[in-house]
Design a protein with these regions (language model features):
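Non-catalytic pre-domain segments flanking phosphatase-related domains
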Residues: 1-30
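Helical "lid/coupling" subdomains associated with nucleotide-phosphate turnover
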Residues: 28-31, 45-48, 64, 68-99, ...
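A short acidic Gly-Thr/Ser loop motif
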Residues: 34-40, 159-165, 225-228, 309
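A secondary-structure boundary/capping signal
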Residues: 37, 106-107
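N-terminal glycine-rich anion-binding loops that anchor highly charged ligand groups
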Residues: 52-63, 67
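C-terminal structured domains
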Residues: 496-507
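A short amphipathic beta-strand at an alpha->beta junction
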Residues: 505-515
Length: 515
């Protein structure tokens, strides 16, 4: 989770006290938020108090409220009717789920339209929903808070694009700093004259003004938020034949933006839409959005680019979190929540972590948190059919909604969990994903998985440490120290697993019974 600071672990044991058992966290049972944007209207219901958001329900409609507004100054009539119907539906759904009142915000289109106040009154009268019309700086703040939901302690620049506006916000040590708003939304730019040349010049002028207002800062990590950016990322995945179709934490380098912009310009839009699974309404905005992104990269010169699937709606959830929950690692909290809910022996993950850590003496804090996550998740898929359990584990790690994970870390976690249940990984349907992880890291994930596979055989009473590992790389010797109480657990299967772990390490296995 680069771009963040290392935080001192809590005092309550290796993993700290689980925040989801705290009364303040439990109060966040279900939270419903509605975002009335220039292009889409969306309802999201977050479930539970895990630090990574669990999406209980997610529905959107591309209404195009801001379509044509640059010419008329008013909300799109058809979009207005469709948005009102969607809000009727969302309110009814919320009542059925028992999550009223909904928190409902409206952004640039409603904010700037002549008939925006009239639309707000109509929504209140017809649905009972109070639309909170937020200004551009508040929109930037909430979007940046959404990024913090996935990456606490982040540094960088957040850029959120909507249909009618584009917002910027600085992040420094997990705090939202300077915020700016601009009219650089694809729908808003439809009325700019002078053809493509005039449009490019207008974008460049506005972008340079934004850069000056941000004190000409360059070289930061750029977090991209918004549907048009996600659509461009999908297209870049298609261009690169990228194997992991998870948009959150998808990384691009500045040089990639010119390549994908050219790819968009040179490829038939309908063909791209079909290949990438992008709606026609969203695809219509992509060509202009790619021009905006290209100029953004030229002007701000970021060091790298990260897609954030978390934005304004997640920022609204973050707003309601107690600070103690905000400060926790979203990955570890989500894994602890999963262990408490699904593992056969909740709490054994901490014991297992102590058991496997001697094998990784040089692991930095980023790798240590992935090892912790693996230990917490090592048993949550026990209900899966034994023939498919290893693949289910890998699929869960690589595709689940887990925050604070780079793509290569997802693959590392998935491989470790796969080897928790299987010695081999050849011939699976995930072979193309393994290449996202360098060879030495693949071996380290295999070592972790086989160590967990062994440790899972050595259960005693909850909280007890029945065995310990000592890795002596200079001697190429792996020692297993068993307590007398645990010695009967070391049967033929456990012995075979210990031997497999030693073989992967290139070590001679040695067993001691002490204590």
């Amino acid at each position: 989770m680069d771009g963040t600071q290392d935080h001192t672990p809590p005092a309550e044991g290796l993993f700290g006290r689980p925040l989801f058992s705290d009364p303040m966290a439990r109060a966040l049972s279900r939270v419903g938020v509605v975002d009335v944007g220039s292009n889409s209207v969306r309802l999201v219901v977050f479930d539970g108090a895990a630090r990574s958001p669990a999406y209980f329900y997610n529905e959107k409609l591309l209404c195009g409220l801001g379509s044509g507004m640059s010419e008329t100054g008013r909300l799109n009539p058809e979009g207005r009717v469709r948005a009102l119907k969607a809000l009727h539906r969302f309110q009814a759904l919320a009542e059925g789920m028992g999550i009223t009142p909904l928190t409902t915000v409206a952004t640039a289109a409603v904010r700037d339209a002549e008939d925006g106040p009239d639309f707000c009154e109509e929504v209140l009268r017809e649905t009972g929903l109070k639309l909170w019309v937020i200004d551009g700086e508040e929109e930037a703040r909430l979007s940046a808070q959404g990024v913090l939901l996935g990456w606490p302690g982040s540094f960088g620049l957040v850029c959120d694009i909507g249909g009618s506006s584009m917002e910027l916000a600085n992040l420094s040590d997990g705090a939202v700093g300077r915020r700016l708003t601009s009219p650089l939304g694809p729908l808003k730019l439809s009325g700019i004259g002078g053809g493509k040349k005039g449009l490019k010049q207008h974008i460049r002028t506005v972008m340079e003004d934004l850069h000056a207002a941000m004190d000409h800062e360059t070289g930061k990590r750029l977090f991209l938020v918004g549907g048009s950016w996600r659509a461009i990322a999908k297209i870049d995945m298609e261009r690169r034949t990228y194997p992991l179709h998870v948009l959150h934490e998808y990384r691009m380098q500045p040089r990639d933006i010119g390549k994908v912009a050219d790819f968009i310009a040179e490829t038939d839009a309908d063909d791209l839409r079909a290949r990438c699974g992008i709606s026609s309404g969203r695809m219509a905005l992509v060509p202009v959005a790619s021009l905006i992104l290209r100029q953004l990269i030229r002007t701000f010169r970021p060091k790298d680019i990260t897609i954030s699937s978390y934005g304004i709606r997640e920022g609204m959830l973050y707003e309601q979190m107690p600070q103690a929950l905000r400060d926790r690692d979203p990955l570890i909290e989500a894994c602890r929540f999963a262990e408490a809910k699904d593992a056969r022996m909740p709490g054994f993950g901490k014991v297992l972590y102590s058991f496997v850590t001697p094998l990784f003496p040089r692991a930095g804090w980023q790798r240590q948190r992935i090892i912790k996550a693996a230990c917490l998740l090592h048993d949550v898929s026990w209900r899966a059919h034994p023939d498919y359990r290893a693949e289910v584990c890998f699929d869960y790690a690589t595709r689940a909604n887990l925050g604070g994970l780079k793509h290569e870390e997802r693959v590392f976690l998935g491989l470790a969990l796969m080897h928790r249940y299987s010695n081999k990984r050849d011939g699976t349907r995930f072979d193309d994903l393994f290449d996202l992880l360098p060879g030495p890291d693949q071996q380290e994930a295999e070592i972790l998985g086989k160590a967990m596979r062994l440790g899972a055989m050595l259960w005693l009473q909850p909280g007890e440490q029945p065995a310990s590992l000592t890795w002596r790389p200079n001697l190429k010797r792996l020692e297993l120290d068993l307590s007398r109480e645990a010695a009967p657990l070391f049967g033929e299967v456990a012995e075979a697993r210990f031997g497999s772990l030693a073989t992967t390490l290139g070590a001679e296995p040695q067993v001691k019974i002490t204590r």
